[in-house]
């Protein structure tokens, strides 16, 4: 538990201003409303996004939970087991997108 808490805390520092959890292993039987309801116990869910596959009509088994604050995200990350429809979800902080092309970062680099 301490290792996962440390990872969560470190990830929170890198995602300041972006209180978003990335959720994997969402069972195909679960609706986005169930996901929203589950994560609402940790704080206000501003947005719940679960992308669908246009060919199959089913969601892709992953999604994003946008919280109102870093504290709410932290509360969700502290929970060891997130279970919906009997399936344990994999929850982690959303990582910043990789920089592409001409994009730059204001993050200091060690060379």
Curated annotation (Swiss-Prot):
<dbReference type="InterPro" id="IPR034152">
    <property type="entry name" value="SLIRP_RRM"/>
</dbReference>
<keyword id="KW-0597">Phosphoprotein</keyword>
<feature type="domain" description="RRM">
    <location>
        <begin position="19"/>
        <end position="96"/>
    </location>
</feature>
<dbReference type="Pfam" id="PF00076">
    <property type="entry name" value="RRM_1"/>
</dbReference>
<keyword id="KW-0496">Mitochondrion</keyword>
<dbReference type="InterPro" id="IPR012677">
    <property type="entry name" value="Nucleotide-bd_a/b_plait_sf"/>
</dbReference>
<dbReference type="GO" id="GO:0003723">
    <property type="term" value="F:RNA binding"/>
</dbReference>
<feature type="modified residue" description="Phosphothreonine">
    <location>
        <position position="104"/>
    </location>
</feature>
<keyword id="KW-0805">Transcription regulation</keyword>
<feature type="modified residue" description="Phosphoserine">
    <location>
        <position position="105"/>
    </location>
</feature>
<keyword id="KW-0804">Transcription</keyword>
<dbReference type="InterPro" id="IPR000504">
    <property type="entry name" value="RRM_dom"/>
</dbReference>
<dbReference type="GO" id="GO:0005739">
    <property type="term" value="C:mitochondrion"/>
</dbReference>
<protein>
    <recommendedName>
        <fullName>SRA stem-loop-interacting RNA-binding protein, mitochondrial</fullName>
    </recommendedName>
</protein>
<feature type="region of interest" description="Disordered">
    <location>
        <begin position="92"/>
        <end position="111"/>
    </location>
</feature>
<keyword id="KW-0678">Repressor</keyword>
<keyword id="KW-0809">Transit peptide</keyword>
<keyword id="KW-0539">Nucleus</keyword>
<dbReference type="GO" id="GO:0005634">
    <property type="term" value="C:nucleus"/>
</dbReference>
<comment type="function">
    <text>RNA-binding protein that acts as a nuclear receptor corepressor. Probably acts by binding the SRA RNA, and repressing the SRA-mediated nuclear receptor coactivation. Binds the STR7 loop of SRA RNA. Also able to repress glucocorticoid (GR), androgen (AR), thyroid (TR) and VDR-mediated transactivation.</text>
</comment>
<keyword id="KW-0694">RNA-binding</keyword>
<dbReference type="InterPro" id="IPR035979">
    <property type="entry name" value="RBD_domain_sf"/>
</dbReference>
């Amino acid at each position: 538990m301490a290792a996962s808490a440390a990872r969560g805390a470190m990830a929170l520092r890198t995602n300041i201003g972006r209180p978003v959890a990335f959720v994997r292993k969402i069972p195909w039987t679960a609706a986005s409303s169930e996901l929203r309801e589950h994560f609402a116990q940790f704080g206000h869910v501003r947005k719940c996004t679960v992308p669908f596959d246009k060919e199959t009509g089913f969601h892709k088994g992953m999604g994003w939970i946008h919280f109102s604050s870093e504290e709410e995200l932290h509360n969700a990350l502290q929970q060891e087991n997130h279970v919906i429809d009997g399936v344990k979800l994999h929850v982690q902080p959303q990582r910043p997108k990789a920089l592409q092309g001409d994009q730059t970062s204001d993050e200091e680099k060690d060379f």
